[in-house]
Amino acid sequence: LQLMWRVLEKIKSENKTIKPLHVITTDTLVENPIVALWVNTSLDLLREKAQNEGLPIFPKLLTPNIQETFWVNLIGRGYPAPNTKFRWCTERMKIRPSDRFLRKLSAESGEAVLVVGTRKAESSNRAQSIAKFEKEATRENFNPHVNLSNVSSFLPIKDWSNDDVWLYLLQEKSPWGINNKDLLTMYQGATDGGECPLVVDTSTPSCGDSRFGCWVCTLVKQDKSMSAMVQNDSEKTWMEPLLQLRNNLNEKDHEKRDFRRLTGNVQLMPNDDEKSVPGPYLKKTREDWLEQLLKAQMKIRENKQLPEEIKNIQLISQEELDEIRNIWFYDKIEIDDSLPTICEKFAKGEYHFESLEDNHIFDFEILKILKDTCKDDEMIFEIAKGLLEVERKHFKSARRTGLFDEFENIFKKSFYKDRTDAIDYAKEKKKIKIAAEKQLPLTGTE
């Protein structure tokens, strides 16, 4: 970014036309709080200085759509914590926000060039990715964008080492006034041991080799950067609740998840017909994650070492909670509407919710009677409340289009007796499918 600033300064000094530079960064809403604070401060200074200097530089902080945030998907829909086999977070929270912005910008301007600070030295995967795009370059140093045909990517520092980056940043002051030494200190604090040694050969670790990411990231075994921050600086121990919650998310969770997929289907494990592929988090688990999140928020705010700038840190927004509540109540037909009660218990007065009384088919006492009538059989209870909720939804409709399809979907999802019955049913379906493919006669129980 500093290099691009200097380029625009030179173009301006030569009285040439300067094309606008949009500085975009994506806030996933679960960024490391220290990093998020530094980024926001830098963008504010950048915006002010660019205006004063008459440079067409426009900082833009992008965020995911409310339906695609981490907590709406995990607590709301019950998506399990991301892993290498189900990495649902990156596309929704990082790629789509920038793609939407670039698509809009390129449509308005005809084309756009995306200048990225990606470097080969970051990782072997990054080096392979850059090498691949270099082969596909339409012109020297310009690569086609993966998703957008009228956007090109330019990587000006792709061959720089970590030391090259730090040497430049410490020798060249930031034009917009952010202190690069503060950035060095932040990386130093996130490095194991808290040291930035003088690099004398390739065996010496470089400063800033740590990578900052989302504090909830479970794609790695350990959040080394945040752990190092807490370990190296006693004033950052307030982040410990974040580390603890992140570690809880990373624990084995099969018992916390439904034996059915979101669609209600039961899928057997590839190498074990006695187990089903776990589906979304169970209702109790989702409620527990919300409780843990609000407790962490409360504990952080109570810490006297919390920086003044983030004393009112909010780990989940009102908008996210409203979306989660709608998913629980309308999509999952969890008509006990437990979210406001949980929020009031663990974040009293922090969040406010409109009444859903007009949408309730029963009050909670009647709901309890219904559950008692089902003799605590969760499958029967699911069917009963599901059918009644569908009927409520269509009650005032002159035409009840889709009513019977919704009834059928309720039965398809919950007609099993229990987990064992569901697995037996899936095994029988698999057996029938194999027999049909082989055109063999069926044998077995009726």
How would you describe each model-predicted region?
Residues 1-446:
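Nucleotide-activated chemistry modules centered on ATP-dependent adenylation/adenylyltransferase
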